[in-house]
């Protein structure tokens, strides 16, 4: 199944090989680490090729109490030279204020996070860069953390230890089982992450984060897909929080976005026609 993610392979084996002592005193190369680093570099090389806008919503299903839905808009702006921005605009949800979150992806792999609170209808306050600690906070009161929205630059693929555990079948697709190990698990986040990556497309089929005791913390998995322009795109992404026993569902409304895009194109054509008529 194609997930519509275009890959740009940035594979560099130099420096990716890990030496281990062998019985004969000669170094041996751990192929699983070499392949793991190669796959991580490939994923980090993914880039959007054009601007896009998608209407979304997050449904939060707590362990107790009623479920709630948080609508928001998102768009991708390609800035060129391998850099782009993902922008999320939310409505207020409980204690979480309406805000605009901007994630800036650079050629240096690491993402920067900026937030603006809405001060009036359609207006936003001062742009503030989030600290490393702040990006692990929930997004709009959901089980998604802010840093999770930066995938593939959501930090675990940049850790030095990347190991290919196996090639497996997941959801009927051939996939890599990739283990990412956090060198500093005490600084927040996961101790390790297991990702199942579609071999054909590079799209994630499942991602599970573990704590230092190897207990599951969060599990991400796409559940529904829709064929758009000949490619399958994720329309529903689930995340399970094992600590709070809650679940959040991220939904993508491509039909609404397509209608808005069509209306925008028609408005532009109408404006051009009016200008020519004058």
Q: Model segments located where?
A:
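Bacterial N-terminal signal peptides that target proteins for export
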Residues: 1-9
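Bacterial N-terminal signal peptides
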Residues: 8-16
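Boundary at the C-terminal end of the N-terminal hydrophobic targeting segment
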Residues: 19-23
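Flexible, processing/modification-adjacent segments and terminal tails
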Residues: 24-38, 47-48, 66, 105-191, ...
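N-terminal mature ectodomain segment of secretory-pathway/periplasmic proteins
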Residues: 31-123
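Well-ordered beta-strand positions enriched in small/hydrophobic/aromatic, beta-favoring residues
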Residues: 54, 86-88, 113, 162, ...
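Short amphipathic beta-strand and strand-loop transition segments with alternating hydrophobic
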Residues: 73-77, 161-169, 223-225
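Gly/Pro-enriched, hydrophobic low-complexity segments
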Residues: 93, 102, 147-151, 167-267
